[in-house]
Amino acid sequence: VEPCSPCPLPNGVAVALTPTGVRLVTNRRGSTVWDVRTAAERYAVKVGRPVPETDEHPGCDWAGVAPAREAVVLQLLETFAVYGTWPYGTWNAQPWHEGPSLYELWEPQRSGEREPSLDAAHACADALAVLHEAGWVHGDIQPAHLIIGPDGTATLIDLALARGGPVPDSVDFPYPGSLVHFESPEISRSLLETGTVAPTSASDVYALGASFFVSATGWRHVDYPDDAPRTVQRKAVATTPHRPVTVPGLFGRLIEAMLSPLPGDRPTSAEVRSVLAHQP
């Protein structure tokens, strides 16, 4: 019996948090996110379930355990998180982060109303550099995972695929790759050739550059049909030059460097942060 969709709020959440209000945020294949308020705090509750294989999509067993893995990662990073199981998978609860994603924040720029906020770009680079300096890689950088808070700082969310610390075997799984729009060529190539790969700080920087590109322009950095199978998408990322970077000035040149096909030619996240710190 497959779980209903959206995944309901598991009983364990009520025991752990005592909710006073609940709102559905997203419901995707393998994951439902709830905005849960308590008398004192606000939490994001993620409920995972395995994704069965279909003619259009490969199966995704790890989606069921991803919330538990993310909670362990957050705990290793000394961030509050709790997790538990439900009949079809696992769930976690973590602090809610208020604010738009980078893509949402830069929407006025894409319509020509104003230039992108390089303060926000700097905040994203700073958050990634701090993660890298702690010995971790994110593995799933994309605009929706870059939240710009009311104070202008950025938070990296969705850390289920992060690597850098001891995750128990009971909640661990091999790195499956990320949203292909933001995979680096070496990640896509390795997944196509061997089926396995490990994310790196350089692949994170590439993904951040691709996130800057699409958030500033509205275009993916590599061109392929929206409905292309994942293998076709990955082949395009691995073999096709990215679209010309039309973002003007030093920021555009920085994005170009971040999207270098050679990992060693990309700036580090700390170097990206330093460049953006000196922009007007």
Language model regions located:
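A conserved short helix/loop substructure at the end of the activation segment
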Residues: 260-271
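ATP-binding glycine-rich phosphate-binding loop
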Residues: 2-39
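Conserved structural core of kinase catalytic domains
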Residues: 82-112
